[in-house]
Amino acid sequence: MLQDVVVRWTGKERANYVRCIMIKQIKFVSIPVADQNRALDFYTEKLGFTIITDQPFDEKQRWIELRIPKAETRVVLFTPEGDEKRIGTFMNMSYACDDIDKTYAELKERGVEFESAPQKEPWGTYTLFKDSEGNRFVVSSD
């Protein structure tokens, strides 16, 4: 009898099951940091992120989870043990904004370090900035 169920489990039923178990979003991204206090100041004061959680994780670190305005994905300022070499490198993620020129000007005024002024490409306009830990990020608009 189980064989009949498995054999007949095709088409619409299978598609519905697959949709139910599929990954639906990125919950958070972890940004490696050397100094959590310095990084927290940067992300809240310069980028305008808000604190969701700031609690002890272990003897060395806290679990600091931040909200990006108008975004579901959260940012975690946390470095897994053994991943310290990632601090100060290019991050394989990018931030999106509505107006790159306005965002660039406002963040530069707040003291954010940029590698260059926004550059226009066929896929959009972008620039690179560094956080307090030397991590490099792309920020772009269409």
Task: Label every PLM stretch briefly.
Residues 11-40, 90-93:
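N-terminal beta-strand motif that seeds the catalytic metal site of vicinal oxygen chelate
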Residues 30-73:
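Core segments of cupin and vicinal oxygen chelate
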Residues 56-58, 84, 120-121:
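A short beta-turn/loop motif at secondary-structure boundaries
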Residues 33-37, 88, 92-136:
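Vicinal oxygen chelate
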